[in-house]
């Protein structure tokens, strides 16, 4: 079979023979794409099927363009269109700009979908962290939907939060238990507007930071507590 390059199919229609041949030569996600995908789906990324579960695609939408570009590069062979700009006015009357992108549908994404999707709904299996979450997954989960607990610029609080409001209390307890057992993180469930979030205590900050540091990109440094400077990060 001839080796078809991505740039040969980027502007072709979905029924193009060449595009179908390009997709057929792709077999599975590489290990980085799989591990990062777990973290992204724990965050705000969607994994969806348009053909009743035969194939899946991943969909992304974020405010941070640099992060979007980074993720699209990570999934480069699966993303055929550049990120597109979205504008909307929120309930306060302010303009909100985000960037959207998606992969094409493919059976390679079924492995991720099988971990999360039950009856077309994103769910958390009780063994997800212990069996599948890696430091790379944790880093993308944090970059996607985590941050420091205290955004006061003078704060010395090193606590971290992972936003899990879209999951049930039971599912978040699964995640907390897994983070404690696998990574020895001192964390627990907090309630934010009647929804569960994961709070990682300051005493576990260095453990957490050392786990995710190899995978963080500089543009997401602002999410870290003030005790870690960009100079330290770039060393």
Swiss-Prot record:
Q: Gene3D superfamilies from the xrefs? A: Homing endonucleases
* Stored Pfam families: LAGLIDADG_2
Q: Name one GO cellular component term.
A: mitochondrion
Q: Which GO terms describe its molecular function?
A: endonuclease activity
Q: Which UniProt keywords apply?
A: Endonuclease, Hydrolase, Intron homing, Mitochondrion, mRNA processing, mRNA splicing, Nuclease
Entry cofactors: Mg(2+)
On the tree of life, the source organism's domain of life is Eukaryota
SUPFAM superfamilies annotated for this entry? Homing endonucleases
What is the uppermost EC class here? hydrolase
- Kindly, how does the activity depend on pH for this protein? Optimum pH is 9-10.
Localized where?
A: Mitochondrion
Q: Name a single GO biological process.
A: mRNA processing
What EC number(s) would the UniProt record show?
A: 3.1.-.-
Spell out the InterPro entries in the cross-references. Answer: Chloro/Mito_RNA_Process, Homing_endonucl, LAGLIDADG_dom
**Free-text function comment from the UniProt entry:** Mitochondrial DNA endonuclease involved in intron homing. It introduces a specific double-strand break in the DNA of the 21S rRNA gene and thus mediates the insertion of an intron, containing its own coding sequence (group I intron), into an intronless gene. Specifically recognizes and cleaves the sequence 5'-TAGGGATAACAGGGTAAT-3'.
Fill in the subunit field for this protein: Monomer.
Q: Which family does it belong to?
A: Belongs to the LAGLIDADG endonuclease family.
Protein name, UniProt field = Intron-encoded endonuclease I-SceI
């Amino acid at each position: 079979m001839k080796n078809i390059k991505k740039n040969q199919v980027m502007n072709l229609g979905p029924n193009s023979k060449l595009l179908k041949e390009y997709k057929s030569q792709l077999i599975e996600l590489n290990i980085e794409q799989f591990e990062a995908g777990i973290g992204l789906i724990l965050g705000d990324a969607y994994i969806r099927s348009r053909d009743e579960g035969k194939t899946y695609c991943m969909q992304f939408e974020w405010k941070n363009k640099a992060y979007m570009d980074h993720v699209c590069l990570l999934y480069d062979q699966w993303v055929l269109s550049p990120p597109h700009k979205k504008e909307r006015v929120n309930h306060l009357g302010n303009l909100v700009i985000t960037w959207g992108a998606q992969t094409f549908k493919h059976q390679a994404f079924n492995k991720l979908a099988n971990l999360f999707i039950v009856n077309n709904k994103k769910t958390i299996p009780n063994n997800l962290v212990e069996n599948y979450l890696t430091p790379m997954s944790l880093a993308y989960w944090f970059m996607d939907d985590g941050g420091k607990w205290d955004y006061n610029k003078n704060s010395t609080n090193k606590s971290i939060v992972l936003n899990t409001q879209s999951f049930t209390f039971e599912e978040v307890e699964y995640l907390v238990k897994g983070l404690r057992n696998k990574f020895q993180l001192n964390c627990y469930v907090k309630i934010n507007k009647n929804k569960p979030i994961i709070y990682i205590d300051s005493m576990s900050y260095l453990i957490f930071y050392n786990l995710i540091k190899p995978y963080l990109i500089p543009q997401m440094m602002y999410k870290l507590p003030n005790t870690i400077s960009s100079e330290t990060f770039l060393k």
